[in-house]
From Swiss-Prot:
Residues carrying sugar: 101, 158, 292, 329, 362, 369, 382, 389
Record GO biological process: cell communication
Tagged with keyword Signal: yes
Residues binding Zn(2+) 2, per UniProt: 191, 195, 339
Tissue and organ distribution: Brain.
Record's bilayer topology term: Single-pass membrane protein
Obligatory cofactor(s): Zn(2+)
Signal peptide (residue range): 1-24
GO CC annotation terms, alphabetical: plasma membrane
Source organism (scientific name): Rattus norvegicus (Rat)
Gene3D superfamilies membership: 3.30.1360.180, Alkaline Phosphatase, subunit A
Protein name: Ectonucleotide pyrophosphatase/phosphodiesterase family member 5
Length: 477
């Protein structure tokens, strides 16, 4: 007969081994949603019950400092790389690369040249290299072949595709036979309307309400698909918006001869490429031209913007004060709402909310950086982050789990010469790993207590038997 204590020992030992292992390998799901141009305080302009539902049952960060320039493509690429614009290479919506001798323009949609994107590696590729699957519904850059890869599933950009259809695809990919563990969902509003009418217009109210309804629809569909309680949903944006006025316009033609330069990017950060031999003339003419315009030589751009160490940043950069608009001449398009200004300005800051099994409940944090999102998502997915400019330590208090240990990274980087180095790389174990370790340790303690009690009882039983034997009289011969 197998001794009882041996059966108990083997059973408990198996449990100790299997429980943490199964928890450690549990695959987390992450869905990142971006509502383009959703300023941090839009949450309070009109009733937004679905946003507040997420806040009450999840986490909310009051102020998110994004990257300069505060435009769509630079900031969406920062969210998925953790890098400043000078490091990931997408420095504006409109760029010229003198090395490639090529232009990149969101306006003309010539954005599909892989070389513009390959100074960094976005999250979906890192996730797929780790053996997982990713899906993207219109997220900027996901329909570009980067490092010979696309997301596992993606929708080519088409603004006419409804939000509901985008959600349907995301749900389909998360519930497929071979499901994704990482999804990206993008919606163009409230940016489009914010440009047309300005963020201070009463016409923004219905747009914000509609986005709240769209978030409610997403939550409803996640619940219907039984994903709501086991998916980590992150709702964020790329930038805010500020109100402009035709009374606050800086017209470059008043100060510069248009034959002496090429205007690569426009308002509110004018990227100026002087014609050969005309640098000093252009700079001198513009340097003190307007009290609401600050003009920098490339090498004099403030370090805090992390913007000057890229070939795609032009020799002269002119930055308008908040609310001021740069036009080459009065015939150029003027927008009542704009962004791209100094990333220290609160009106440029986006939202950040999150809900899911990894996040705390009803928790509000004062501030974070958009570069921090990358390491947070890598942590949730338990994939190794590449060198980045963010900090997991800066956002780990959003999580309900124990904070992971950190070690310095050892990978080399391909950052431009003179660029700021990425912050300390943090090795992030997934939070189920720590739950598993805790439960495993608890079971091990219980096992040893049971084993010791069993051994004590066995010894006591043997001792009692011996005492009874001694008490019996010897047989008479």
């Amino acid at each position: 007969m197998i001794p009882e204590f041996l059966v108990v020992s083997c059973t408990l030992a198996a449990l100790c081994h299997s429980v943490p292992l199964s928890l450690q390998t549990e695959q987390q799901k992450v869905l990142v949603v971006s509502f383009d141009g959703f300023r941090w305080d839009y949450l309070y302009k009109v009733p937004t019950p679905h946003f507040h539902y997420v806040m009450k049952n999840g986490v909310h960060v009051k102020q998110v400092t994004n990257v300069f320039i505060t435009k769509t493509y630079p900031n969406h690429y920062t969210l998925v790389t953790g890098l400043f614009a000078e490091n990931h290479g997408i420095v504006a919506n409109d760029m010229f690369d003198p090395v490639l001798n090529k232009s990149f323009s969101l306006e003309h949609m010539n954005i599909y040249d892989s070389k513009f994107w390959e100074e960094a590696t976005p999250l979906w590729i890192t996730n797929q290299r780790a053996g997982h699957a990713s899906g993207a519904a219109m997220w900027p850059g996901t329909d570009v072949k980067i490092h010979e890869s696309y997301p596992t599933h993606y929708l080519p950009y088409n603004e006419s595709v409804s939000f509901e259809d985008r959600v349907a695809k995301i749900i389909e990919w998360f519930t497929a036979k071979d499901p994704i563990n990482l999804g990206f969902l993008y919606w163009e509003e409230p940016d489009d309307t914010g440009h047309d009418v300005g963020p201070d217009s009463p016409l923004m109210g219905p747009v914000i309400s509609d986005i709240d309804h769209k978030l409610g629809y997403l939550i409803k569909m996640l619940k219907k698909a039984k994903l709501w309680n086991n998916i980590n949903l992150i709702v964020t944006s790329d930038h805010g918006m500020t109100q402009c006025s035709k009374e606050r316009v800086i017209e470059l033609d008043q100060y510069l001869d248009k034959e002496h330069y090429t205007l690569i990017d426009h308002s509110p950060v004018a990227a100026i490429l002087p014609k050969e031999g005309k640098f000093n003339e252009v700079y001198d003419a513009l340097a003190n031209a307007h009290p609401n315009l600050t003009v920098y030589k490339k090498e004099e751009i403030p370090e805090r913007w992390h913007y000057k160490h890229s070939d795609r940043v032009q020799p002269i950069v002119a930055v308008a004060d908040e609310g001021w608009y740069i036009l080459q001449n009065k015939s150029d398009e003027f927008l009542l709402g704009n962004h791209g200004y100094d990333n220290a300005l609160a009106e440029m800051h986006p939202i950040f909310l999150a809900h899911g099994p990894a996040f705390r409940k009803n928790f509000t944090k004062e501030a974070m950086n958009s570069t921090d999102l990358y390491s947070l998502v890598c942590h949730l997915l338990n994939v190794t982050a590449l060198p980045h400019n963010g900090s997991f330590r800066n956002v780990q208090d959003l999580l309900s789990s124990a904070a992971p240990k950190a070690i310095p990274y050892t990978q080399s980087t391909t950052l431009p010469l003179g660029s700021a180095k990425p912050g300390e790389y943090e090795q992030e174990e997934s939070y189920p790993y720590y739950i598993g370790i805790s439960l495993g340790s608890l079971i091990a303690i219980v096992f040893f207590v049971v084993l010791i009690k069993h051994l004590i009882r066995s010894q006591m039983h043997t001792l009692q038997y011996m005492q009874v034997e001694v008490a019996q009289p010897l047989l008479q011969a």
